[in-house]
Amino acid sequence: MTLQVMRRVGAMAILVMGAVHLQQYLGDYQFIPTIGPLFGLNAIGSAVIALGLMLPLERWLRERRGEVAVGLLALGGVAVALGALVSLYIAETGTLFGFSEGTLDTVMWVAIVSEAVAVVLLAPVAVANLVGVGAAPGAARS
């Protein structure tokens, strides 16, 4: 699988994750203190990251700046997905900001799978695009 395919599929996984969080937020989660706003922020952040990963940033920005932008967006996607996975685990096994999940519904499994796919696919994209960021211009990338 090429990095370009990983980037696009990872972006779709982030979009699915955000859609699940938006659906939950628009349901009862918007009324849960702290957790509700975090679900809303996850949905917004996921949409921004997914859109950024789908855009031809390398074409719009100078080549290296585009690569760095893609790397940072991919890293952001990994961070949001890992944060959501860890938060769900904490809420399932204990409490998170006073909130605990009761059971793993189908929608939660959709979120878990999309978050895991996003991490697996976007981590290599982030690494590949951010390697040598501090190197001098024109220096060979390994």
Model-derived regions: residue spans:
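Membrane-interface extramembranous regions
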Residues: 1-142
